Amino acid sequence: MIVYVTGAAVVPRRRVRSFPYLEGEIAARFPRFGRFDEYTQIGCAAVFKAAWQAGFRPGSPLRNVGIVLSGQYGSFETDEAFYATTLAGPELASPNLFSYTLPNIVIGECALQFGWMGPTYVLDGEGGRGDAALAEAAADIERGRSEAMLAAWLELRPEWAPRGAEGAAVIVIETDRKGRRPLLEMDLSRGGRLALTSGERIVTIDDILSALGDPGLAPGLLEARDTP
C-alpha cells in the first residue's frame, strides 16, 4: 500500500525557545507550556509543528491518529532533577517536576490537544534515530489500527551521558493525502517494511528527513554543538 509523509519537524534542543511559533499557536494550545519540563517542551514543539504542517487542528474530525516515541534516555534528566528536590525532605519535593517524570507524558499532552485516540506509546530505542518508532508506526498502519501515525524521536542527554544528538524529530505518516500534495510517498509492504517508491529502503527517521531534502529538516541539525 502507498502511504504519505504529510508533515515533518526537527527541533534541536538548543533552539526550542527561539522558534517564533512557540509564542503564537503553540502558546494558545498549550497554556501550560512554560511549566513543562524541557523534555516535554521540545517534544510538544516538534509534534505540534509536524502535525500543523500535515493539516491537523484541534477538533479535526480524524481521531484515529497515534504517536510512537522512541529514545534512549527518556525523561531521565527530569527524573534526576526531581530526585534532587527530595534530598532535603519529601515535603520539599517538586510537584511540578514530578508531573513529568515519565517519558509518555509528552505524547499524552499532544494527543489531548488534538483529540487523537489512536495507539500512543513510548519505546526504548538504541539503534538508528527513531528506527523503533518508525517500524512500529508503520506496523500500526499496516494492521489497520490507525489512519495516521506520528513517528517521533526525542532525546535529552543527562550530564553524565556520552555527548551526542539532542532534540526531537517527528514524521507524520498517513494513508490518505486528503487531496493535498504530500511531502513524500512511500510503499508500505507486509511486515511494516517501508521503502521509497523508487525502491530505496527506509529504516530510520533520518532516512525520511534526508529524502525530503529540506535544509531545515536536516538530521545534522540535531547533532551536538560546542555553543548553544
Regions found by a protein language model. Give the residues of each.
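Conserved "HGTGT" condensation-loop signature of ketosynthase/thiolase-family condensing enzymes
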Residues: 1-135, 139-146, 151-228
